[in-house]
């Protein structure tokens, strides 16, 4: 009986964490003090995170710090959280493309910030902040695509794993350089990479600090497709066309599908099935459902 109660409590907690907007992985009970971390990150300016929301339901999130290969400053980390919160509340949204400015994705963390945050406590605080942010990003009810142009290094490579899909241009490369910096991935990249390519391939990629060109990344299942163009504008257009095939339909249906997949990935079977039931209740008998039934009825006559 006690074992059953413990499992039920654990399940409901996981569901709450997965679906309640604004909840994070870490809190003060884990030694994480978000406001203090924000004050620290604010001391490291540079660059920006830009968000453009299109009428077709596709958002374009741009990592914009081209003088440093779009490395994340402390301020950019804060802005990323702000954009994630904005996207959580974008009810018309269906898809999202993440890219870097000036035809390169991101080189990870800004070394100026890294040098100033030299203690294990500093490292773990930033780790928890970025794990919180990228987990919320991963759970967005939007189908997300990382458009990898140029280099995705370190934390930039980790960010690509928080997206549902990855597309590369012919000349682009992904590299988890953490071992050469004397650390391991800390923005959730290891956990997500294992899910994407399996533990054996992930161990090779991480321990070898392998330079994954577009061909190799495609072969191991890291990316879905290699685009035809390396041009910044043309490759973005290609990525938009690629994404459109998965977001055709009403926002409420696309968003429910993404939430259902997140549940299947993160929850125990019983809880995932219950959540699937609840999500079905948000679309069954809705406008899109009734319209589709009416159309099918016409075809059957």
From Swiss-Prot:
The modification N6-acetyllysine is found at residue 211. The modification N6-succinyllysine is found at residues 211, 295. The keyword Cytoplasm applies. It comes from the Eukaryota. Decarboxylates ethylmalonyl-CoA, a potentially toxic metabolite, to form butyryl-CoA, suggesting it might be involved in metabolite proofreading. Acts preferentially on (S)-ethylmalonyl-CoA but also has some activity on the (R)-isomer. Also has methylmalonyl-CoA decarboxylase activity at lower level. It is an enzyme of class 4 (lyase). It catalyses: (2S)-ethylmalonyl-CoA + H(+) = butanoyl-CoA + CO2; (S)-methylmalonyl-CoA + H(+) = propanoyl-CoA + CO2; (2R)-ethylmalonyl-CoA + H(+) = butanoyl-CoA + CO2. GO terms for cellular component: cytosol. GO terms for biological process: fatty acid beta-oxidation. It holds the Pfam family ECH_1. Belongs to the enoyl-CoA hydratase/isomerase family. InterPro entries: ClpP/crotonase-like_dom_sf (IPR029045), Enoyl-CoA_hyd/isom_CS (IPR018376), Enoyl-CoA_hydra/iso (IPR001753). It is found in: Cytoplasm, Cytosol. The keyword Repeat does not apply. Transmembrane segments: none annotated. PROSITE patterns: ENOYL_COA_HYDRATASE. Its EC number is 4.1.1.94. Keywords: Acetylation, Cytoplasm, Lyase. GO terms for molecular function: carboxy-lyase activity; methyl/ethyl malonyl-CoA decarboxylase activity. This is Ethylmalonyl-CoA decarboxylase.
């Amino acid at each position: 009986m006690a074992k059953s109660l413990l499992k039920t409590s654990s399940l409901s907690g996981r569901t709450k964490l997965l679906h309640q907007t604004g909840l994070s992985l870490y809190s003060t009970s884990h030694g994480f003090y978000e406001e203090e971390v924000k004050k620290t990150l604010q001391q490291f300016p540079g660059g920006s995170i830009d968000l453009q929301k299109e009428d077709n339901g596709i958002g374009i999130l741009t990592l914009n710090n081209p003088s440093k290969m779009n490395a994340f400053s402390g301020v950019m980390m804060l802005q990323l959280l702000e954009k994630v919160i904005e996207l959580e509340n974008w009810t018309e949204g269906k898809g999202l493309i993440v890219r870097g400015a000036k035809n390169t994705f991101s080189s990870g963390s800004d070394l100026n910030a890294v040098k100033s945050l030299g203690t294990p406590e500093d490292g773990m605080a930033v780790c928890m902040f970025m794990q919180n942010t990228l987990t919320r990003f991963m759970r967005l009810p939007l189908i997300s695509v990382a458009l990898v142009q140029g280099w995705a290094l370190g934390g930039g490579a980790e960010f690509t794993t928080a997206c549902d899909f990855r597309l590369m241009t012919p000349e682009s490369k992904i590299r988890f350089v953490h071992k050469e910096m004397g650390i391991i991935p800390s923005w959730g990249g290891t956990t997500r990479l294992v899910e994407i390519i399996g533990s054996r391939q992930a161990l090779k990629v991480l321990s070898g600090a392998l330079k994954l060109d577009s061909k190799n990344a495609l072969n191991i299942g890291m990316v879905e497709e290699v685009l035809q163009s390396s041009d910044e504008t043309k490759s973005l257009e290609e990525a938009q066309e690629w994404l459109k095939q998965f977001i055709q339909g009403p926002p409420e249906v696309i968003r429910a599908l993404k939430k259902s997949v997140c549940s299947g990935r993160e929850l125990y079977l019983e809880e995932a099935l219950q959540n699937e039931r609840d999500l079905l209740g948000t679309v069954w008998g809705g406008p899109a459902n009734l319209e589709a039934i009416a159309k099918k009825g016409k075809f059957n006559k």
